[in-house]
C-alpha cells in the first residue's frame, strides 16, 4: 500500500511539471482561470507585492516581470529572458507607478520579428526601425533643401539676367557727341571777324584777351554774314 501511494505521488508531481512546461510558466507570471496572464513581483524586504498587470500571453507577463526585477534587484535579478536585459525599458524612478509603466511598455514590445542572434551589433528591433525612419527623413529633407537651394540660385541668376536686359545704360564714350570743337591754345586763336576786334570795350580788357566759345563764335560769324 505504501509503495503504491508513493508511486502515485511521483506520477502526480511529474504530471504537474509537464503541465507547467506546456503552459510555458515564467517567473513572476501566473495564468488565471479565464486564460489571461498576470504578473507581479515582491518588493525587497517586504511582504507586499507590486501588481504589474494582466496580459494575453505568458511572454508579455514574463517581460513585465523582468523589467520590475531589473529595476528593484539590479544585476542580481533572475530573469526570464536574460538575453533581452539590455533592450528592456527602465522606469524613471523606483516608484510603483513608474515600474508599472515600464513593465507595460516592455510587455508591448515585439521581439519575434527578427531573431536576436541575427541582429548586428546587438541592436534591438525597435531601435533599428526608429534609426531607419530618422535616416529616411534626414535624406529626404537634405534632398529637399538642396533642390530648393538650386532653384533659388537659378531664379536669382534669371532675375539678374532680366535686370541686365532691362537696365542697360548707354555708353558715354560712344553716344556723347560734341557739337563744338575743342581748340588748343598753343595752336593759335581762331580768327575773329573785324567787328569783334573793334569792340574793345566788350571783349578786351587791357592786354588780356577773352576767348569765346567756338559755338558762340560760329553764331557770330553767321550773323555777321
Curated annotation (Swiss-Prot):
Its main location: nucleus. The keyword Transmembrane does not apply. Residues 1-26, 134-157 are annotated as: Disordered. Keywords: Activator, DNA-binding, Ethylene signaling pathway, Nucleus, Phosphoprotein, Transcription, Transcription regulation. SUPFAM superfamilies: DNA-binding domain. InterPro entries: AP2/ERF_dom, AP2/ERF_dom_sf, AP2/ERF_TF_ERF_subfamily, DNA-bd_dom_sf. Gene3D superfamilies: AP2/ERF domain (3.30.730.10). Expressed in roots, stems, seeds and stamen. One of its GO terms (cellular component) is nucleus. Residues 1-25 have a biased composition (Basic and acidic residues). CDD domains: AP2 (cd00018). One of its GO terms (biological process) is ethylene-activated signaling pathway. Probably acts as a transcriptional activator. Binds to the GCC-box pathogenesis-related promoter element. May be involved in the regulation of gene expression by stress factors and by components of stress signal transduction pathways. This is Ethylene-responsive transcription factor ERF042. It comes from Arabidopsis thaliana (Mouse-ear cress). The gene is ERF042.
